[in-house]
A protein has these predicted regions:
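Canonical radical SAM enzyme core domain
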Residues: 122-125
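Pol beta-like nucleotidyltransferase catalytic core
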Residues: 11-119, 130-223, 230-360
């Protein structure tokens, strides 16, 4: 089949509609030695677990995430199976950011209080349309604390960490569970990009330029030195800078969690409340506004702090794998719901867009 990147506008719409009706058209069947085929890659006719959740997404990499983040790439966590299509009515529907990779509106027939909008975008005004969710009596998992605090009769808002890929290094849950990264001959790396669309991007780039003038480190990412697997820019390093584009209590991303799964100590700027989620000894917090921040980083990378705090870093790694792993988190939430499902109805789902006119 022709790559979707080569299709014209009209053909893309037809292809997108076919993908929604038949997601196996665009799914790869992921296998590795000793692993099962991902449940997301086939039409299910029987229940693989007591609870079945059908997934819709605008990620474009959800199936790869299911393969990497669940045991044996199975798509199952505890009592919940995360799938694409079924020949029976699933118990839950989960919408990851929005329902269509191509920005098309989608209608689903689902129980509203068994429909989750799982949002991974930053909690900025530019991204507010994602966090507001859609439908009546649906559930929105959002890291936007201001929005979650509001009383809203239309839908249930639940404050949560962002629902993202969790880690982006090319290692599976099973591989990371047994791996130990002992040999770290290199000092400091930073994986970032030259994207400068929003204020947070530009703030990060300004700090990067300061750092490059005064400190020796290895820089990777789009616009700098491309790398196929982030593991290779983290695992050999004792320290790596993890700099979020948005600063909010519940917002932390793979920038931080990639460090932990590679057992690298993050030098971190981001969530002011990050030590609620991970051990304080597992990272070093920095303030870009501190006039001594660069000498502080130099002192850190010259030290054996990584070795001294290896236990805390490994505990943070465990938390990424078992608690903040997207599918572990969603399974825990789903299993905690006690109310009865509402009757199914048609829920119309549009595709929100980032409002780049709001630069915050």
């Amino acid at each position: 089949m022709q790559s979707d990147n080569c299709l014209d506008s009209g053909s893309r719409k037809v292809y997108a509609a076919q993908c929604y009706r038949n997601p196996e058209w665009r799914l790869s069947t992921f296998t590795s030695e000793g692993s099962e085929t991902s449940l997301s890659a086939k039409l299910l006719t029987e229940r693989p677990a007591p609870i079945v959740a059908t997934c819709l997404d605008s990620w474009g990499v959800l199936d790869d995430a299911i393969h990497h983040l669940t045991p044996k790439g199975s798509g199952i966590w505890n009592n919940v199976a995360f799938v694409r299509t079924t020949s029976f009515v699933p118990d839950w529907h989960i919408v990851f950011n929005s329902a269509s990779l191509f920005g098309l509106p989608v209608d689903i027939e689902a129980s509203p209080n068994r429909t989750i909008f799982a949002i991974g975008e930053p909690p900025t005004k530019a991204h507010r349309a994602f966090h507001e969710g859609q439908g009546k009596n649906t559930i929105v998992l959002t890291c936007d604390a201001e929005l979650a605090a509001r009383q809203n009769a239309a839908r249930r808002f639940v404050l949560s960490p962002p629902i993202t890929r969790s880690w982006s290094v090319n290692k599976t849950y099973d591989q990371l569970l047994v791996s130990e990264v002992v040999d770290k001959p290199l000092r400091l790396s930073w994986i970032t990009s030259d994207i400068a669309l929003l204020k947070g991007h530009r703030y990060r780039l300004a700090f990067l330029e300061r750092l490059r003038k005064e400190l020796d480190f290895d820089l990777f990412g789009r616009g700098f030195r491309l790398i196929g697997d982030k593991w290779n820019a983290l695992a050999p390093y004792r320290y790596s800078i993890a700099f979020e584009n948005t600063r909010a209590d519940y917002y932390f991303t793979e920038k931080l969690m990639d460090c932990f799964v590679a057992e690298t100590m993050p030098i971190y700027y981001g969530s002011p409340a990050i030590t609620r989620f991970f051990p304080s000894d597992s990272m070093v917090l920095i303030d870009p506004e501190d006039k001594n921040v660069i000498p502080k980083i130099q002192e850190i990378i010259d030290s054996d702090l990584w070795k001294e705090r290896r236990g805390a870093i490994r505990e943070a790694k465990r938390l990424v794998l078992e608690k903040y792993n997207t599918f572990a988190y969603l399974a825990g939430f789903i299993e905690s719901v006690q109310d009865k499902p509402l009757p199914p109805e048609i829920i119309h789902i549009d595709s929100p867009e980032v409002d780049f006119g709001i630069d915050e």
